[in-house]
């Protein structure tokens, strides 16, 4: 979809309600609960990715990409939702994908999607966008947080070491919130598919740290 910019007068002094009202009355697009965003450069062009946690079919959520063509125009694409194929089955991921909340980007430009599900059921998905066109070909479950009551948030990759990631764990039933450092000994190859092997290594480390993996 092609998009254009709406200029809101005195936006820097407007309250949240006024900004939303101004967008809607100006024929702007209303997304349901946008939560997080990442920006990366592809072929010299900046692309913005954001998670709309409760948008889409039955409020399940979706992730969008916006190619920033110029100061006044952009191209909006549906990056991932429940209709995106699951990597290991080649069928739509369906109800397994629910309420994408946070995003993360690794040193190779790959996008990770962190869910906001009830504690103990939240997944982190690796988005396979092999050609970097802003539309994920498939999703692979990268990690699952099975700790009772807990929610993963704030996934972050070390900018100086692609083998290291950090994940915040909050709302645990044990009341023991923490930040976990995950590291592997696999040296990533310069292709997106190699991240699957790296991801499997991280899942194993994550499971050992926080408990049994969900199957």
Regions found by a protein language model. Give the residues of each.
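Short, surface-exposed linear patches
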Residues: 165, 208-209
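A short, hydrophobic C-terminal helix/tail in secreted or cell-surface proteins
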Residues: 188-208
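Short, charged juxtamembrane terminal tails flanking transmembrane helices
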Residues: 211-215
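Sequence/structural signature of beta-propeller domains
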Residues: 1-186
